[in-house]
C-alpha cells in the first residue's frame, strides 16, 4: 500500500515537472509561467484579475500566455481583433468551460447545452414587440414596488439605506416579477427570495474558482436549495406560458430530455444570468451621479425636458444619460470572455503580427483592460467623466482613436459583435427606469456629503458587472 502511494506521488511529481518544462515556440505569444511549478500565477490571477493582467500587459504587450493551476491561458488584449478571433468557432469552443462553471456554481449538468441556440431563442423574446411588452410590464412592476407603502416611507420622513442594497433589491424584485412571470408580489416573500439570492451571489466567485471553505459552501448550498424550490413551476405562482421567454426555455429543456430536478436548477442559472447585473449597474450609475454634482444636474435637466414623452420616446432621447451609462459601464463591466482552443490556431493582431495558439490551451479576452481602461484610448481612464461619450453639441460620441487609428470598440459592456448579450436592451430600459423614477419621485442625498463611490470587490473581476467592496449610505424621502 505504501509503495503504491509513493508510486502515485512520484508519477504526479513527474507529470508536474514534465508539464512545467513547457517552453515558448516560434511565433507563440510571450510565455510567463510564474515561479511556482504547476500553480504558476493562479493565486494572483484569482485574487485580482485586473491588477494581474494589467501588470502582464505592461510586461509583455497585447498578447501573452500565463500558467495558472496547470492550465496555459493566452490572454488577448487587442480590442480591434476581438471579433475576428472569437468568430472562429471551429477552433475555439465556449461550451466546455461553460459546463465546468455550471457544475461548480449551480451543481447542474446540461449535456446538450448549446450557447448559440440559447442566445437565438433569447433574442426572440428580448427585442421588437416582445421587448416592448416586457418593458411595459417592468415599468408597472417597478412602480408597484416603489410606492411609499412598499418602501416603508411616511410623509416627509427621511429613510436611510445602502444605495447598493436599494438598487439591487428593487431591480431584482422587478426583474423576478417581470421575466419569471411571478404574480405573487407579496413584499415579504420577494424580500426573502432576494436575500437568499444575495447570499448565493456573494459566494459565486468562490464557487467558480473552487476556493470556497466548508462553512461558506454550506451557506451557498442552503441558499441554492431554497431558490430551487421557489423557482420550480409549482414554486412560481403559475406555470410559464410556452410563448414567453421562460416558457420557451422550459420547453427547450424538456425537448432535450432534461429531467425535472435539473430543470429547476437551470432556473437558478437563468435567474442569475437575467438579474445578476442590472442592479449592480444601477448602483454604480446612481453612485457616480450622487458623487458628481455636475453630472447629476445635467441628467436632471434632461429628464425634466422629456417628462412629456411616452416611455419608448423617453428611452430613446437621453444622450446625456446614455453617456453617463456608457461611462459607468466602461468603469464597471468586467466580464472575462473564455474559450478552449480545440485545435492549433493562428491569430493575427491589428498590427499584422501573427501568433500561434496551441490545442489544449485556453484563450481569454478581457475588454475591461482594453479598450475600457486603455489610457491610449481614454484620457484618465480611471476617472468618471459623465460627458466622455458626448460630442460638444450633446450628441453621441462614437469615434475614439488609438495611435491615430479609429478603434472599433471604445467599450465592450455587452460582448463583442457575434457574442452580444441578448438581454442588453431590456437591462438598459430597467436601469433607466429605476434611475429616472428615483430622481423624479424622491429626494435622495448622501448621508456623508464628502463620500465617494466605494472601491470594487476585486474577486468579482470576470463575472460581469463589478460589485462594490462596501456600500454608499444614502437617505431618501418622497418628493412633493
Swiss-Prot record:
UniProt-listed Enzyme Commission number(s): 5.3.99.4, 4.2.1.152
InterPro entries: Cyt_P450 (IPR001128), Cyt_P450_CYP7A1-type (IPR024204), Cyt_P450_E_grp-IV (IPR002403), Cyt_P450_sf (IPR036396)
ATP-binding in keyword set: no
Transmembrane parts of this sequence: 1-21
Keywords annotated in UniProt: Endoplasmic reticulum, Fatty acid biosynthesis, Fatty acid metabolism, Heme, Iron, Isomerase, Lipid biosynthesis, Lipid metabolism, Lyase, Membrane, Metal-binding, Prostaglandin biosynthesis, Prostaglandin metabolism, Transmembrane, Transmembrane helix
This protein's record includes keyword Zinc: no
SUPFAM superfamilies: Cytochrome P450 (SSF48264)
Signal sequence annotation: none
Main location: endoplasmic reticulum
Disulfide bridge map: none
MF terms (GO), sorted A to Z: heme binding; hydroperoxy icosatetraenoate dehydratase activity; iron ion binding; monooxygenase activity; oxidoreductase activity, acting on paired donors, with incorporation or reduction of molecular oxygen; prostaglandin-I synthase activity
GO cellular component entries: endoplasmic reticulum membrane
Membrane topology value: Single-pass membrane protein
Coiled coil: none
Reaction(s) catalysed (UniProt annotation): prostaglandin H2 = prostaglandin I2; a hydroperoxyeicosatetraenoate = an oxoeicosatetraenoate + H2O; (15S)-hydroperoxy-(5Z,8Z,11Z,13E)-eicosatetraenoate = 15-oxo-(5Z,8Z,11Z,13E)-eicosatetraenoate + H2O; (15S)-hydroperoxy-(5Z,8Z,11Z,13E)-eicosatetraenoate + AH2 = (15S)-hydroxy-(5Z,8Z,11Z,13E)-eicosatetraenoate + A + H2O
Subcellular location: Endoplasmic reticulum membrane
Pfam families cross-referenced by the UniProt entry: p450
GO biological process: prostaglandin biosynthetic process
Annotated family: Belongs to the cytochrome P450 family.
Protein's job: Catalyzes the isomerization of prostaglandin H2 to prostacyclin (= prostaglandin I2). Catalyzes the biosynthesis and metabolism of eicosanoids. Catalyzes the isomerization of prostaglandin H2 to prostacyclin (= prostaglandin I2), a potent mediator of vasodilation and inhibitor of platelet aggregation. Additionally, displays dehydratase activity, toward hydroperoxyeicosatetraenoates (HPETEs), especially toward (15S)-hydroperoxy-(5Z,8Z,11Z,13E)-eicosatetraenoate (15(S)-HPETE).
Designated name of the protein: Prostacyclin synthase
Organism: Danio rerio
